[in-house]
Amino acid sequence: MQRTEDASLTRERPFEPKRTCLLLIDTQNYVWNPEVAKRVPYFDRQVREVVLPNLRRLIDAFHGARAEVMYTVIENYTRDGRDRSLDYKLSNFFIAKGSWEAKVLDAIAPGDDDIVLPKTSSGVFNSTNIEYLLRNIGIDTLVVTGFLTDQCVDHTVRDAADRGFYPVCLPDACATHSETRHESALKAFAGYCRTMTTAQLLAAIVAATR
């Protein structure tokens, strides 16, 4: 028989700034640039008109609440990329250490005390020390945003849930290369996280910091 305290657990929890981290997944020049914009106009439009404005608002709100903001970028640790996962080698993901492609988009650039984690796998928990950092900081809730919804965002949501965090996904702060892919991914991992809009989370931040 299930314990009473377990049966009462819920994903619908109040916003606690000290225990919450905004995580921006792969919001970098490699993922969105003029060449990608021409090739994938839907993605370009979503990034420009929806995702970047929402991320900017979220970053400002988290900084204002003195809550953690963290970034991941796909970036080799070595010049020749030997440290990459086998899948990244097979997929030809080669983002040189310190390159323009590895840099976070200017519109949502990290603050001087935000953490930026280079990763060489789809799942941030697999190739960085993010779990160690989150535990040290006292984070139990991870707001997952960024690119791509059906790839690295999906990985992060599921892995965070498996590691005992409370993942929150904001569909209007994520994007991928088609609406079908975006919606299918959100539906597939919905059971692993709480889903909110950017406006709902911003309202929760205001309520928590009055």
Regions found by a protein language model. Give the residues of each.
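Short acidic, Gly/Ser-rich segments with clustered Asp/Glu that frequently serve as metal-coordination loops
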Residues: 28-34
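Early exported N-terminus immediately downstream of N-terminal targeting peptides
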Residues: 66-69, 73-92
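A short alpha/beta connector and helix-capping loop motif
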Residues: 18-20, 36-62, 66-74
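N-terminal nucleotide-binding beta1-loop-alpha1 segment
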Residues: 21-27
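Surface-exposed, active-site-proximal loop segments in enzymatic domains
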Residues: 36-43, 82-86, 160
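Active-site-adjacent betaalpha module
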Residues: 1-21, 57-65, 87-210
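Active-site loop/turn elements of alpha/beta-hydrolase fold enzymes
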Residues: 27, 74-76, 172
